Amino acid sequence: MIDDIQLSFGLPSVLRKKVTAAFDGGRLSSDSGVMLLALADRRRRVADRLAVLIADHRDPAHITHTVADVLRARMLAIGCGYPDGNDFDRLRFDPAFKLACGRLPETGADLCSQPTISRWENAPSLREIIRLTYTLVDIWCGSYAKPPRSVMLDIDDTVDVVHGKQQLAHWNAHYDERCFLPIHVYDAATGAPVVVILRPGKTPSGVEVRKLLSRLIGRIRRHWPDTCISIRGDAHYGRDEAMTWCENNGVDYIFGLPGNVVLDRRVEPVADDIRVRRALDQAEVLRGFAETRYAAKSWQQERRVVARIEASASHADDMLRRGIDIRYVVTSLQESDAEHLYETVYCARGQAENLIKQHKAQLSSDRTSCRSALANQMRLILHTGAYWLLLDLRAAIPSWNPLQHTEFATIRLRLLKIAGRIIETASRIRIALASCCPEAETFSLVALKLQPSGP
């Protein structure tokens, strides 16, 4: 009773009745939907596949929390919106999280604590981190029932601001911050993460991009030796070293390319025609396309360059731009015309920014506050594992339901943040979910879809 009085707080009265509240409801959970993520993990086995790669030197007779248990709890918490390990000060007692991790909600042992999580985030060696990162590629390849004929991979980096003296932190003048610039690679067709790699906060060099592509494509070729692979990225990745490697290894590419006076001179006749036609037609915007063969001084050969040329009224008085805006891409693709390559193929890479936003903003993968670069890479791996769980959960939503096309934050709100009371008896466990849940039908259908097919 003393504890209840200490925890109670008042709320506005309703119809002259006093309202008080206290966190004394007992074995309740505000995240009962975590059971859906647990079903997704049982199918994908992300935690188990990662755990076997981390050496555990503890005495098996005295282990309460296996490595798989620790990683699974961490990924489930990230998926439910708890990216901070300190949240386990309370979550370790949550009955829904305990049940999702394979423990009895009342009589079972509590989950691991924050210090245990931190120790295992810092435990993997460099070789283990490399193997764990390669496993992300293996998980993606395993998501296909059979090798695809072709895949398009989107590659991009994102700023991850740091506030300490972490390893690999670097000053970036463009962002005016000390930061990391981790590289994200996604499957353009499915939105699935292929790999996420922590790196210093500076623009990647051509040699760095070449090495990354060499290791990534080499790993993919182990699974799919005959699949046609294409790489799509902005001008950061359109370096001669990377393009030469792609050409020598049967990989197609389409990259952004910075403009210069040589390229502008090559497309000037087309640009002038578009500028004049826009003025004569008094159109607000007129767009056209051109292409040429071009080789920068540092390039070993000429390559196909496509130009998107846009004349608009807003640029008409701009003396520097001469009433025109030109964007270039360089590509090894030869079959399509210039308009299709730019409008359909290259511009579709904008979706990668939305995928990075889900990874970074909605799963808080920028919580890279460990001093060690290896520990921060381990965090990116765990956040990518949580991404897979939410991706599988979204795929299990019926096609007629608009939730199948929503972002992770909405799915978390509608399907994971559901109140429930978990009751453990001698022979069974019952989860009593909120009766007024708006997504009760969807929750049931998703749970059935994610059920394992075996006995």
Predicted features and spans:
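Short amphipathic alpha-helical "interface-anchor" segments enriched in bulky aromatics
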Residues: 40, 88, 341-378, 382, ...
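Short acidic (Asp/Glu) and glycine-rich catalytic loops that position anionic groups and cofactors
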Residues: 13-19, 50-54, 95-99, 245, ...
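Short, surface-exposed basic-aromatic patches at helix termini and helix-loop junctions that form
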Residues: 243-252
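C-terminal structured "cap/appendage" subdomains that terminate the fold
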Residues: 384, 389-433
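Dynamic "connector" segments at or just before major functional cores
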Residues: 1-177, 181-204, 210-223, 418-455
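Acidic/histidine-rich, metal-coordinating catalytic segments
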Residues: 156, 226-238
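An anionic, glycine-rich sequence signature occurring as long contiguous blocks
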Residues: 4-22, 252-361, 449-455
